[in-house]
């Protein structure tokens, strides 16, 4: 935007009239009659009154104290003089202004704001996931970086038609590489895709028509896509433009709207992943060489951005309403502002409203249309959100701003001073300024944020700054009446009034006072004073004589006095006859303090040389110099001794520190060794415990196995003297041992209790002999032959249903009877008892 002329700048002066808001505030529900004016804005430009334009890169004072002095705000716009805004006085008096009420309803708490670092990262690249952990162990390597395609993907919730009234939600640029153009192996590619460094797409997973797929693609933290198959990205309904590298470099086949979309998209150079360093460097060079040369179509004009909050000055709301009044879509703007009023009532509210207004009638010459230009984006937000940090909220906010910029709704940004707390205001404006400049927008204006600058700006605009200088001593001539003449004579001078801003009046006054005290001001006037006493800075016309002609009256007197002294000295040395003559030296009040002009000092030159006073002063001076030198030498010696002591102490401390480090290292090594020994002991103990537990389990099992046999032996021990049991038991054991050695397969070790008697032992011995004879024969065994023998067929001889597999079996199929006594009628009780008795002593023989 071209800056408006100096005489056309509009100045909004804040007045102390907050108590009269109900009378002077225009209503948002503006009546179409618009009978009576309430606000009057004038262009105050005269010969002795000038404006001050702040520099564009002025920094905000974030730690300034909060004050309630009137503020001066310069709007860089063109408007006619004596602009009157008519409103309905009855509505304004009774109901008040909803916008004023919204603006000054609640005071912003006086708190400091520490902006997190994440907000700055969000402003520059709102698609990066800060929690994503990546390891820079490998690098995405491209075979030919010039072979790529790209496309711009709009948010799936945005509209496809170019309507500035529609709120867009941002867009994103993607670069596409084929899998054959990537040198990394499959494992690295899959790892990059899992970490979110790249987006891996194949034809099976590509679902361009699904909204969820578009959202995942848009919200992905990477801008680089690697395709395995031929994928048609034109199928994506939300793609604004798809192009190749050749089209971008030539820029001949791209439409102006496509150029804007490409230039203002989020590029891969905004990524922070170390794996994409080569790609980032490549696209950074591409942006600097190609994208900056893309000619953007700015025929739509320059737009203005209003940031409207619910805590601002009443005068600022006047300026906004004055700007909106007379607009073609005035009613629409006011209705949208009123619709957000209730949402902003709560202090904890987190609401924000975006709406754009398009100027359709430009040829009517309306001054408000010149102010709004073509497009106007109005943003209403609660400033309390600036005091807290919500990452999702800031992502959405900057995404909205980004889309408005990309769609050319906002090419230039207007920032007004709308937040009352200066510390909060400085943070917010600085943050918005950084965001818009990151996307290539021009911040047209920034308001004064401190009271000192406001006072200085108001003083320099309303009244010239006066400086009183002693022209006799400093040789400075001030001409207040020539300031406008000089500005008119040099309209293009870079040192003119409109390019300077007074920063500190107190510092200027101190410099001027220093000049007044110093009679020899040639050096000062030639350098710093010439820069300091500029007409643009002080509001003065300063005439400074050249150094060679700047000799003052005092300097002339000093030079004449020095010449007289030299002549008198030469005459005294050349002629001894003049020793008795008297040389009269005249001293004025300015040279010798305390001596008036009518006092004289008379003495001869020899008397002056030989005077006791002079000798006394000379001896005293020499003594003082000698004492001072001796004192300095002593101080130097003491300092040297101190330095030596400090060096010795330092050496000893260093040595002690080395010893401590060595001892600490030895202790650490010993501790590590002890830890290893303890660990080895623990391992040995654990293995030994496992072995002992295993042995204990085996002992328990053997104990359970031998417990019934021991009980039976005890029974026999108790009855050893009854019925000749000892005599029969030895043959029984011999026969049982022979049977076990001959047929070990008859019994598996299970024991059954029984009663002992002499007859039973005789019967058992006979049965065992019969079993041994029967089991050692080579005849075929039939089930009927086993009745009464104490033997039975094994379980393998029967099928699932309990039927014999065959009619006859080999003797190896025999087993000791394994049924309880009395369960089977086919076996006698004696055979069962013998079988059980044999089982009890099977493991003992």
Curated annotation (Swiss-Prot):
Residue segments, region Disordered: 17-37, 550-573
Coiled-coil annotated spans: 622-707
The keyword Coiled coil is assigned to this record: yes
Keywords, in A-Z order: Coiled coil
Domain of life assignment: Viruses
Protein name as it appears in the record: Uncharacterized protein VP6
Species this chain originates from: Fiji disease virus (isolate Sugarcane)
Lineage: Viruses, Riboviria, Orthornavirae, Duplornaviricota, Resentoviricetes
The gene coding this protein: S6
């Amino acid at each position: 935007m071209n800056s408006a002329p100096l005489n056309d700048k509009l100045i909004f002066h804040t007045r102390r009239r907050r108590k009269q808001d109900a009378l002077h505030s225009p209503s948002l529900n503006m009546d179409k009659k618009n009978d009576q004016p309430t606000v009057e804005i004038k262009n105050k430009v005269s010969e002795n009154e000038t404006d001050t334009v702040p520099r564009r890169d002025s920094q905000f004072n974030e730690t300034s104290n909060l004050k309630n002095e009137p503020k001066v705000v310069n709007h860089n716009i063109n408007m006619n003089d004596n602009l009157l805004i008519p409103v309905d006085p009855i509505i304004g008096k009774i109901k008040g202004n909803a916008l004023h009420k919204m603006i000054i309803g609640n005071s912003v708490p006086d708190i400091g704001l520490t902006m997190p670092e994440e907000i700055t990262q969000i402003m520059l690249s709102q698609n990066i996931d800060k929690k994503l952990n990546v390891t820079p162990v490998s690098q995405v390597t491209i075979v030919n970086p010039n072979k790529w395609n790209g496309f711009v993907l709009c948010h799936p919730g945005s509209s496809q038609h170019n309507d500035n009234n529609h709120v867009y939600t941002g867009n994103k640029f993607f670069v596409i590489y084929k899998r054959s153009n990537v040198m990394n192996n499959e494992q690295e590619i899959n790892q990059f895709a899992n970490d979110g460094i790249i987006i891996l797409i194949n034809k099976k997973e590509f679902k361009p028509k699904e909204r969820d797929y578009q959202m995942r693609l848009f919200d992905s933290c990477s801008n680089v896509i690697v395709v395995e198959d031929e994928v048609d990205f034109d199928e994506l309904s939300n793609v604004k433009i798809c192009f190749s590298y050749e089209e971008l470099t030539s820029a001949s086949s791209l439409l102006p709207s496509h150029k804007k979309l490409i230039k203002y998209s989020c590029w891969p150079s905004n990524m922070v992943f170390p794996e994409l360093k080569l790609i980032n460097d490549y696209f950074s060079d591409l942006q600097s060489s190609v994208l900056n040369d893309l000619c953007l179509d700015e025929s739509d004009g320059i737009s203005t951005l209003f940031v409207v909050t619910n805590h601002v000055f009443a005068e600022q709301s006047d300026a906004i309403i004055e700007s909106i009044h007379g607009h073609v879509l005035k009613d629409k703007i006011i209705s949208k502002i009123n619709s957000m009023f209730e949402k902003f009532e709560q202090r904890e509210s987190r609401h924000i409203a975006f709406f754009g207004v398009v100027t359709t009638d430009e040829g009517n010459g309306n001054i408000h249309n010149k102010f709004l230009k073509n497009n106007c984006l109005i943003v209403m937000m609660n400033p309390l959100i600036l005091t807290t940090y919500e990452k999702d909220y800031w992502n959405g906010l900057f995404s909205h701003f980004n889309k408005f910029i990309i769609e050319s709704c906002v090419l230039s940004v207007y920032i007004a001073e709308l937040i009352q707390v200066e510390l909060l205001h400085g943070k917010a404006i600085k943050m918005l300024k950084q965001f818009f400049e990151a996307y290539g927008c021009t911040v047209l204006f920034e308001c004064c944020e401190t009271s000192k600058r406001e006072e200085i700006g108001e003083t320099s605009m309303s009244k010239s700054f006066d400086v009183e200088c002693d022209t006799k001593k400093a040789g400075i001539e001030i001409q207040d009446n020539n300031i406008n003449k000089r500005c008119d004579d040099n309209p293009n001078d870079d040192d003119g009034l409109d390019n300077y801003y007074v920063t500190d009046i107190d510092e200027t006054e101190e410099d001027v006072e220093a000049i007044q005290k110093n009679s020899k001001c040639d050096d000062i006037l030639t350098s710093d004073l010439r820069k300091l006493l500029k007409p643009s800075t002080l509001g003065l016309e300063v005439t400074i004589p050249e150094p060679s002609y700047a000799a003052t009256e005092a300097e002339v007197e000093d030079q004449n006095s020095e010449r007289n002294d030299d002549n008198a000295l030469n005459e005294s040395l050349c002629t001894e006859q003049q020793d008795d003559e008297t040389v009269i030296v005249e001293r004025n009040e300015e040279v010798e303090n305390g001596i008036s002009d009518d006092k004289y000092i008379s003495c001869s030159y020899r008397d002056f040389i030989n005077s006791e006073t002079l000798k006394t002063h000379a001896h005293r001076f020499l003594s003082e110099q000698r004492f001072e030198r001796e004192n300095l030498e002593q101080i130097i010696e003491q300092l040297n001794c101190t330095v030596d002591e400090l060096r010795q102490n330092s050496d000893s401390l260093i040595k002690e520190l080395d010893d401590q480090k060595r001892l600490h290292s030895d202790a650490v090594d010993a501790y590590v060794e002890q830890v290893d020994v303890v660990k080895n002991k623990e391992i040995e103990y654990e293995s030994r415990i496992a072995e002992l537990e295993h042995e204990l389990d085996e002992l328990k099992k053997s104990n359970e196995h031998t417990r019934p046999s021991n009980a039976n032996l005890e029974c026999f021990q108790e009855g050893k003297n009854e019925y000749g049991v000892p005599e029969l038991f030895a043959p029984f054991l011999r026969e049982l041992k022979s049977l076990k050695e001959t047929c070990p397969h008859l019994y598996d070790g299970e024991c059954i209790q029984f009663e002992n008697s002499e007859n039973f032992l005789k019967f058992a011995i006979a049965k065992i002999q019969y079993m041994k004879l029967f089991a050692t024969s080579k005849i075929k065994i039939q089930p009927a032959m086993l009745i009464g023998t104490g033997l039975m067929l094994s379980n393998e001889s029967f099928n699932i249903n309990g039927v014999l597999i065959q009619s006859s079996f080999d003797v190896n199929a025999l087993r000791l009877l394994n049924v309880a006594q009395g369960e089977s009628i086919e076996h006698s009780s004696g055979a069962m008892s013998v079988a059980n008795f044999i089982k009890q002593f099977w493991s003992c023989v």
